[in-house]
């Protein structure tokens, strides 16, 4: 919820934060636009015209924006746990009738009850690695029930090379990531911490920041990272008939599962 009366002010603030978010994310994802293009291309190739798309852990709406721009008949429902990101998304896209944003917490086994399916496509980008393995497994089974017949699930994320059996690949990938980040941050792009600091200090979102701090209070530590093979096996077990990688740059993949 915005803390100002003028929605135009909130929209301008949200647009600026969204731009800074996108720049910050590109520092971590060198070919983010290609990742997004792959996702939108696969939706267009696999689903019918005018697809209904669910964006998991949508953040401030960047992937949803790419989808509706690439697919004029598409509509996107974005779900996220974070009230600050949702507030920014709702303000940034308040005039976009083909996008809506819903609060949902994947740690809650009943999260999908807040979502009216089915969907032609379910997507996510740089988000699901935050989930604990048991939550991710349950989520993939939920997605298999939410997506319609011949529907598609697409997840763009970094799937790390194994440091023991793929040591060289992991080393050169980390060197590449460091080089890209150093260049971006050196030219003034927000760091991850810097973006959040700027967003939380924005008066427009004071209420959302308070809510965010309550939600994330006591939540510390990163989830163990599952290898890409494990992701694909879970999706097979969940009932998807075809699974595989449809795009890759080093450890950055778009994995695809067709129902």
Q: Which residues are covered by each model-predicted region?
A:
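A conserved beta-strand element that flanks and buttresses the S-adenosyl-L-methionine
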Residues: 123
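Conserved glycine-rich SAM-binding loop
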Residues: 59
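Conserved class I S-adenosyl-L-methionine
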Residues: 1-47, 62-66, 154-191
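Class I SAM-dependent methyltransferase SAM/SAH-binding core
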Residues: 54, 62-109
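Core SAM-dependent methyltransferase catalytic element
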Residues: 238-259
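A short glycine-rich, Lys/Arg-flanked "PGG" loop and its adjoining helix->strand segment in the class I
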Residues: 137-149
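Short alpha-helix
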Residues: 223-238
